Amino acid sequence: VELEIGCRFDHVSDVAVPAVAIVEPHSSVRDAILEARWEGDTAEQYEDADGNSCRRLVLPAGASSFSYSATIRVSPEPDEVPCAEETQHLIEDLPSDLLHWLLPSRFCDSDRLADRAWELFGSAPRGVDAVQAVCDWIHDNIAYGVPTVPTTNASEVLAQHGGMCRDFAHLGVTFCRALGIPARYVSGYLPDIGVPKDEFDDFHAWFETWLGARWWTFDARFNVPRIGRVPIGRGR
């Protein structure tokens, strides 16, 4: 399936502002891009340590804008769902390059929520069932559309029982890490294919966990497999 994706940012500032724009598909799906268009000031392109496609630019004083659009090929099938055989590894058996996906981070304070995670999910079977239990609980107990700020972390989302899609993803990552499951945050484009149009026309966020021998997609906001995800950024 060919999909049109894109975004536009309008910016006003009294002074010039150095910035990094991460709005293009992740390097892992770069080969699926059929055509891409960048409109705005010239920007240096680079790939960061997590494989994110970045543009480094300086937004001038006054009003300015930039936009990105692309045609990309996506699978017509919904997200692949892991089977029960995709096991959760013991921490001592994990590859060393996955260990940092277990550590707490700025938005995913798993050290603070470890007790709560084990209280809620400690009795669930390990692996796929545990991650799905996390998604089910967040989907059922965290209200979507509750305003948060860019600095809101998982503990604050849990305390106010509400948030936006990024907050659902942060909380999912946090609970999984507290349970010893490597997890990472993902932002991206998610079209309304085969579902009613979402009233929130924006980027989406979900998370991935390492089970068996690969990363798997989980989405606590919608909590069902979806068609056409295009990852932009992955991180801690």
What residue spans do the PLM features occupy?
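Intrinsically disordered, low-complexity N-terminal segments that are enriched in acidic
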Residues: 1-85
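Generic structural "secondary-structure junction" signal
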Residues: 5, 59-61, 74, 109, ...
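Secondary-structure boundary elements
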Residues: 13, 76, 82, 92-163, ...
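A broad, low-specificity signal for short, low-complexity segments enriched in glycine/proline
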Residues: 26-35, 144-147, 166-171
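Low-complexity, flexible helical/coil segments
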Residues: 41-48, 55-57, 102-111, 218-224
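Glycine-centered loop/turn motifs
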Residues: 62, 124, 196-198
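A charged helix-plus-loop insertion that forms the helical arch/lid used to bind
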Residues: 87-91
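Hydrophobic/aromatic-rich core segments of domains that either
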Residues: 136, 167-236
